[in-house]
Amino acid sequence: MAHDEQWFTPRLQTAATLCNQTPAATESPLWLGVDLGTCDVVSMVVDRDGQPVAVCLDWADVVRDGIVWDFFGAVTIVRRHLDTLEQQFGLRFSHAATSFPPGTDPRISINVLESAGLEVSHVLDEPTAVADLLQLDNAGVVDIGGGTTGIAIVKKGKVTYSADEATGGHHISLTLAGNRRISLEEAEQYKRGHGDEIWPAVKPVYEKMADIVARHIEGQGITDLWLAGGSCMQPGVAELFRKQFPALQVHLPQHSLFMTPLAIASSGREKAEGLYAK
């Protein structure tokens, strides 16, 4: 099912409002999606209408360049999210959808969820998850995460090309740490609350990302470019990409941090309809 901006914009707002808060009341069947990111782990629950009803988020350094390097830490976070959600809803989540960066082994994400006590109902790469949610035509999807940037080309709702580049929010933090002479951990915290202030220092990194995207989408004949991922929430990113790609319609939804988790949870709802919390 195709979803336009009127469909997902309020859902992203709802996800942001519910993040680590009391879940929304619902009697609907519920589906769980787990996004294992470089800087965060997000578990999102959606109802039959694809509306987020609960969101758990932990900032965590458990994934680097698309690889789970702290397996125990990742499992611990997912298990904690699962325990929280099951206690809040009084239901058992036996299945969840998840994703992986293009070009990496999906078994990495699957193993984390299985070790946390979940069966994986559906798995797909990150930009494909967003592309499936939007059901685009002649468009590119750029998912700028913490450690990687996923790029997908979509024609008539089908992903015809995907790639992953080892650049993302982690590299922004490295640049900021060097610029301000602070630790990487301090830089991670600082960038979340000082977006306008840090833009001059980190803009060159985003310019490099845009150059990388340009190489991947060259000659693909797309008309629209959709940006997703938490690293896109930096003020200045949308304007930079619009200047880099003046011939394209560049879209950046608010609260893009939750776009991939919403896409993952929605894929579980649409592709594994009978596997919901009971």
Residue ranges and their predicted role:
Residues 141-144, 149-154:
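Basic (Lys/Arg-enriched) interaction patch that binds polyanionic ligands
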